[in-house]
Design a protein with these regions (language model features):
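Short glycine-/acidic-enriched loop or helix-start segments at secondary-structure transitions
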Residues: 16, 39-40, 59-60
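A secondary-structure boundary/capping signal
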Residues: 7, 31-32, 44, 133, ...
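Glycine-rich FAD pyrophosphate-binding loop
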Residues: 22-42
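Glycine-rich active-site loop/strand segments that organize a redox cofactor
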Residues: 43-109, 129
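Accessory recognition modules or surfaces
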Residues: 1-7, 11-12, 36-50
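N-terminal Rossmann-like FAD-binding beta1-loop-alpha1 element of flavoenzymes
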Residues: 2-29
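Hydrophobic/aromatic beta-strand patches that form the interior of the parallel beta-sheet core
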Residues: 28-30, 48, 137, 164
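Rossmann-like flavin
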Residues: 86-197
């Protein structure tokens, strides 16, 4: 029997190890933390979502990234010190920009499939992880953000993911604790949440 090492005990590592065991491999899972799923899998808020499938390879991301380099609280930080690995990664990132639409559609299809696998595995193994199939609401404070989300929604729909535009009143009906002023939102009913631990 072949033995495979999987490095990282987040959702990707654990599900990869599970799939390999199902195929007859012996698997050893290595995790640097005391508990599994303490980094990215924990930070995503327990989302089992396909509605975040928009790829980052877009001109606007590059422009935002340049602005963010001047902020200490940026959502994405890139150390500007050049290295061969970093420069080649950036070149590949930029080269993928013309494929933004096709890649977003393909990523939506992949995300839907991954979500279905997770649901099936949890059911087959009897895993209770506080699954809530209540959808995920994305909110936008201005027309520009909402209009961009509408364009993304068309790509997600092409990938098989329905999501609908909602008004501020509809947003408050979906999420009664929502406060503040918003332009609108998009609600993906098929998205879910669960407890990664």
């Amino acid at each position: 029997m072949q033995t495979i090492a999987v490095i990282g005990g987040g959702i990707t590592g654990v599900t990869t190890a599970y799939a390999l065991v199902q195929r007859g491999f012996a698997v050893t899972l290595f995790e640097q933390h005391r508990y599994a799923a303490m980094e990215t899998s924990f930070a995503n808020g327990g989302q089992l979502s396909a509605s975040n499938a928009e790829v980052w390879n877009h001109t606007s991301t590059v422009l935002k990234g340049l602005k963010w380099m001047l902020r200490s609280d940026a959502p994405l930080l890139v150390n500007p010190t050049p290295t061969w690995h970093k420069l080649s990664w950036m070149a590949e990132f930029l080269a993928a920009i013309p494929k933004y639409e096709a890649n977003t559609v393909a990523t939506a299809r992949l995300a839907i499939s991954a979500r279905q696998h997770l649901f099936a595995w949890a059911q087959a193994e009897g895993i209770d992880f506080d699954l809530k199939r209540q959808g995920i609401l994305h909110i936008y404070r201005d027309k520009a953000g909402f209009d961009h989300a509408a364009r993304v929604s068309r790509l997600l729909a092409e990938g098989g993911l329905p999501r609908r535009a909602v008004t501020p009143d509809e947003m408050r009906a979906i999420e009664p604790t929502l406060a503040g002023s918003y332009y609108g939102g998009f609600f993906t009913e098929s998205d879910s949440t669960g407890d990664i631990h």
